[in-house]
A protein has these predicted regions:
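A short beta-strand-turn-helix
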Residues: 38-55, 85
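N-terminal targeting signals for export/organelle localization
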Residues: 1-35
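Hydrophobic beta-strand anchors of alpha/beta hydrolase catalytic cores
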Residues: 57-58, 90, 113
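Typically the conserved alpha-helix immediately C-terminal to a functionally engaged Cys/Sec
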Residues: 67-84
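Structural microenvironment flanking redox-active thiols in thiol-disulfide oxidoreductases
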Residues: 95-102
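Non-catalytic, surface beta->alpha helical segment in thiol-disulfide oxidoreductase systems
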Residues: 74-76, 109-141
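Short active-site neighborhood of thiol/selenol oxidoreductases, capturing the structured segment around
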Residues: 52-65
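A short glycine-leucine-enriched loop at secondary-structure breakpoints
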Residues: 104-108
Length: 141
């Protein structure tokens, strides 16, 4: 190898390393596991709420929602959020496959979070991306 090729080889190795590690980080974020024990049926969540006395945390989401996808690898994978969520019956509502509750609660933005009574009465609402520390603060109000 000639000395004039060394800088090209070194730069090439650096570019390849950065591209590889960047791809790994994105893959990990996309495949992070949610640790919230989501229910997927609002009526069942209401029944559980009546039995336990815990209010319902309703999370309205969609597969095409970028902030919702980011929350999978951040907020919903965070242990402090999981701990704060133990005071609630968490239910995840896909707006595309569950249009009835989406319409009933007039959900217009993704993601939307509602705190509901056991009868389904809305008590609090918030919309948009929430990182773990913001979610915990909101849940503890």
């Amino acid at each position: 190898m000639t000395s004039s090729m060394r800088p090209v080889l070194v730069i090439g190795m650096i570019v390849l390393s950065v591209a590889t590690f960047s791809g790994v980080s994105e893959w990990r974020a996309a495949h992070a596991k949610e640790i919230i024990p989501w229910r997927d049926d609002l009526a069942a969540a209401q029944a559980e709420s009546r039995q336990t006395g815990r209010p319902i945390f309703a999370y309205f989401t969609a597969s095409w929602c970028p902030p919702c996808q980011k929350m999978k690898s951040t907020t919903w994978a965070d242990n402090t959020v999981k701990e704060a969520m133990q005071k609630f019956v968490p239910v995840k509502i896909d707006v595309d496959s569950q249009p009835e509750p989406t319409a009933r609660y007039q959900v217009r933005a993704m993601p939307t979070y509602l705190i509901l009574s056991d009868s389904g009465q809305e008590q609090r609402r918030r919309e948009g991306l929430m990182l773990p520390e913001d979610m915990v603060r909101w849940l503890e109000k």
